[in-house]
Each structure stands twice: as C-alpha cells, then as structure tokens.
Regions:
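Extracytoplasmic
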Residues: 1-10, 17-18, 22
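Interfacial helix-loop-helix hairpins and adjacent transmembrane helices
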Residues: 163-216
C-alpha cells in the first residue's frame, strides 16, 4: 500500500517570493564571485567567469532535460556547486602562478599547472560527490532535491574547471605572443608578499576550540529540538 511520506502545500504568493529569493541568491553569488575573481586574478578571472556561467547553464539544461523539479533546497545545491567550481579555479590558478614563479613560459606553466592541480581538485570534488550520492540514495523530499542539483553541479564543475577553462587558456596562449594575467595591483599589494603569523594566535584558538567542543558535547547530552520533518505534526507559515 502507498504511504504519504511528506506533503507540503505552498500558496502562490509564498511560492513566487521563494523563487525570487532563490534566484536572487544565485545572482548575488555570481556577482560577488565575478568581482572577486576579476579583482584578484585580472584577465584570468574572465576564464573562471566564463567557466562558471557555462557550469550553471549546463546544470540548468540537464535539469530541464531530465524534467527534474527545481526546489529551494535544489537552488541551495546550485549555489554550493558554484562554490566548488570557484575552489577548483583558485587551486588551478595558484598552481599556475607557482609555475610562473619558477621561470617557466606561460604556455608551459598552464600545462604543468593543470597537471599538478588535478589531484587536489579531484579530491575535493570526489568527496562532495560521495556525500551527495549518499544524500541522493537515502534522502527524501527537500534532501533529494538538494542532492540532485549538487550531484549535477559538481560533476559539470569538473568538466568546466578542468577541460573548458584549460581549453580556453591553451587556445589563447598557443601562439606564445599573448597570455593571461594572474595579478592585479590590488592582489600584488595585499597578497603577493602577505605574511600572517597564525601561530601567535594559537592560545586564542585553543580557547575558541574548547568552547565550541564543550557546546557540541552539551548539544549531544541535551538532545535536539526536532522539526516536523523528524517528529511529525504540522507546520504553518503565515
């Protein structure tokens, strides 16, 4: 026999507001990331911006082709996928900068930079894919929607981050007469010779870590306040 696991009714006004809020979150995320990448990585930031745009377009296209339902948790999964895609580009660009610092040509630095950054990029994405796969296998309702978009977004992020961005860079620098820049006046002035003495703050870190640990132990002892998803009942949004 069929059993209703979850039932949710959303009025048209709340639904429209939720959709608008979700897409506004995606737009603001993109805007903040674009500005950050351009300010920090100069013209190389444009490659990351193009790759991120393609990532979102491909993800939405696959969701549409699969006739998947886009939910608010699904939008959250998209935003998380954008973050993972940015992380991949940061790892790659920083590795290329290290290769350039060794005196290599821009063309060779791109080849070696992508080759030597593959392992950390794959590690991060595979860890997220495993988590998303577990949520997809055992999750229901909103959790399933989140896991679906997260799986797609992270998988496509690998394709765009490792293949598409590399293709753009290699085509642009193939002649050896032009290349992308990886520094701006701001990033040079603030970060190129930055030195942060984190060890001097270790005592403060010990105290903060101890407080967080005690709070975590306390939450386990006292238990959690479960929502209607776990305890059952009704929830009203007015």
């Amino acid at each position: 026999p069929a059993h209703i696991v979850q039932e949710q009714v959303v009025g048209p006004t709340l639904g429209a507001e939720s959709i608008a809020a979700g897409f506004n979150a995606i737009a603001l995320s993109f805007l903040a990331i674009f500005v950050l990448m351009l300010v920090y990585y100069s013209t190389s930031g444009w490659v990351a911006c193009i790759s991120l745009t393609l990532n979102l377009m491909f993800t939405m296209g696959v969701l549409s082709a699969l006739h998947a339902t886009l939910t608010l948790p699904g939008i959250a999964g998209l935003v998380l996928g954008i973050g993972m895609a940015v992380d991949a580009h940061v790892l790659i660009f920083e590795r290329i900068k290290e290769e350039l610092a060794l005196g290599k040509s821009h063309k060779q630095a791109i080849i070696d930079g992508y080759k030597r950054s593959n392992a950390p990029v794959l590690d991060g994405h595979i860890a997220q894919l495993i988590t998303a796969a577990i949520l997809f296998s055992f999750g229901l309702g909103p959790v399933l929607g989140f896991a679906t978009t997260q799986l797609l977004s992270i998988t496509i992020s690998l394709f765009c981050g490792i293949l598409v961005s590399r293709l753009i860079k290699e085509i642009y620098t193939a002649s050896g007469k032009r290349h992308f820049k990886y520094f701006t006046p701001v990033s040079k002035a603030v970060f190129q010779k930055a030195h942060f003495d984190f060890m001097s703050m270790r005592k403060v870190s010990y105290i903060v870590s101890a407080v967080i640990l005690i709070g975590g132990i306390g939450s386990l002892v006292n238990g959690f306040d479960y929502g209607v998803e776990f305890s059952g009942g009704r929830s009203y949004t007015i």
